[in-house]
Every structure is written in structure tokens, then in C-alpha cells.
Amino acid sequence: MKEINIAKMIAKKRKEKKITQDELAKYLGVSKAAISKWETGQSYPDITFLPILASYFNVSIDELIGYEPQMMKEEIKSLYQRLCHDFTTRPFNDVIEECQDIIRKYYSCFPLLFQMGVLIINHSMLDSNQTQKLNEQAKSLFERVKLNSKDVDLAKQAQMVEAYCCLLLNEPQEALVLLEGSQKPQLSGEVLQATAYQMLGQLDEAKAALQISLFKSLISIVEAFPMLLSLGGVDQFEEIVSRFMKVEEAFELRKLNPYVVMPILLVVAQGYVQLGKVEKALDYLDDYSKLCTYDFYPLKFRGTPFFDVIEDWYETFDLGNIVPRDEVLIKKSMKDALLQNPVFTVLHENERFTHLVNRLGE
């Protein structure tokens, strides 16, 4: 039972008091073997001993028990979905206050803390007066998960998102420290897994492992394009755009994960505006608006005939196959990306621009 940590607390408090198991046993009138079993979790003290132990160690009974409530994966998923929706229907401060209560209650449930951090950074922009403070809190949550979780994969994820929080907080040097070593070559675990499955004759499992490996690598490649476009210079801009569009078409990215394609179309449009090629920019914004209104609602990640195991893979995530924000907020952000982007201000009087903005409002 993960919620009860009395074994650990008795051992800890006894050592802090600098007494032996024998001395504690004599004080309570029990055997040394009983104390040993309590401290190793083989048995629990009788309920009548709890107030005596708490008084002896000068702690509350709750602290002695070490009660650390946990939440199951499906409960975390359901809670996250509800809170996402609440941000669109309830006052922002009310939802944030509920989040704080949940964090306090489940401060040792690290999978939940991780998702609460994700929830916060995906909604902190809804109140600009609190954005900085909330992003700082999210960063501290990811740091706590990184330092305390026994789940190695979760701790690694927490460190990555902690680095992302550093960027949100304009702390690039700290982000680099957290990301140190991330560029070192790493052997793909999925490829090794696929090889093992193949040797066992489990070909479907081998195929699934390879698909997941390829998909993860593909997403990493695509996520690099926006910054490449901004850093590549005028002479490389159209070459980078051309290469991205070939990758996007080859793997049907807009069907697979439209959310990674949308921001790149916006960056391409921005680049063409800055190059003075307004019609080219509008072509990509038109593509963006059509993609935003494509029939992929309800929002979730989907597979394709080539990537036919991806949907099932997403279902293994803690949040399952859902996006991190509510559909209402996502639709609003799609429109805001055009109207609130200063680069596109010069297009506001353009008839084509007005038409595609209206399309997003439909």
C-alpha cells in the first residue's frame, strides 16, 4: 500500500532519536522482532500504539503514518480532462485554486504532479498577471518529480519539461545545464526491442516497436524545422521550406499529427511576409486555416495506414490519446495566432486574410 509509509517513518524517527530497536521495544513493551517487522513493513503496529508512538516521536499521527495519497492512472486522466474543460467554463482563479488544493493533497503522487505541471504551463497564459508565477510553480513541480520519482522515465520527462519551463522563464543558461548530454548518441531502445521480438518470431510486436521508433524520430525532425527556418537565413529559407513540405507529404503528417504542422505553416508564412512575398504568405496561411478546420475533431492523435499502431501507443500514455488543452481553447488559439501576431498586422486589410480569419471563426 503506497499511501501508508509508517514503516519508513518509524525507522526514520527512531534513528533521529538515536535509539535502538531494542530500546524502543522496551519502551512499548513489545519484542525487538515486532519493531523489526514494523520497520520492514512485514506488519503494522496495533492501532492502540499509534498515539503512544506519535507522542514519543513528537509528531502527529498523520505524520507518523506517513500518509501519502496516490491517484491511479485513469483517475489522473479523468481529472486532467475535467480541469482542461473547467478552464473554459469557470473563473480562472477558481480552477487554479482547485489545482493548488490537489497539488497539496497529492504532493507525493509524482505522476499526478507531473500532469499538474503540464496543465499549468498549458493554461498559465490565460491570466497574464499570473503567468510568470504559475510557470515558476510548474518548474518546481517538475524538479520535485525529477528528484523524487522512482520511475526513471518519468524523472527524465520531468527534467526535459523543467528545461522547457526555464525557456518560458527566460533562463536559457539553466535550461542548457539541465539538457547537458542530451546530444550524445543514444541507441534506440525500440530497435533493440524489435530485434528481440523478431528473434522470438513475434513479428507484429517487432513492427510496432519499429513504427514507434520511426514516429518519435520523425516528430523530433519536424520540431526542429521552425527554428531552422528562423536561423537559416534568406538564402536557405525556401530550401528548408521545400524539404519540410516533402517530409510532411511523404509521411502524411497533417493526418498523423496536425498540431506539429500548424506552427510550421505559421512560421513559413511569417518568413514570406518578412521577405515581402505577401501572396506566398497568404498561400501558407490559407493552408493553415484549412488544416485548422479539417475534420479531425474530437481532438486526438490519429494513425495512418503507414503508422497503424500509433493510436494504440498513445493510449498507453498517462493521459491517453488526448491533447493537453480543451478544444475551445485550442480553437481560440488557432485564430489568435493570426490576429495577435504582429508580423501579420500588415495583412489585416487584405481580403484573402480576412476570409481565412473568418473561416477559423466558423
Language-model segments: residues:
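Generic helix N-cap/helix-start motif at coil->alpha-helix transitions
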Residues: 73-80, 106-113, 149-159, 182-192, ...
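DNA major-groove recognition helix of helix-turn-helix/homeodomain DNA-binding modules
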Residues: 48-63
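Alpha-helical protein-protein interaction modules
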Residues: 221-350, 354-355, 359-362
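A short, Lys/Arg-rich alpha-helix, primarily the initiator
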Residues: 1-16
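Short alpha-helical DNA-recognition segment
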Residues: 18-37
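Solenoid-like repeat scaffolds
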Residues: 69-70, 100-108, 143-151, 177-187, ...
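Alpha-helical segment of the N-proximal tetratricopeptide repeat
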Residues: 74-108, 115, 122-129
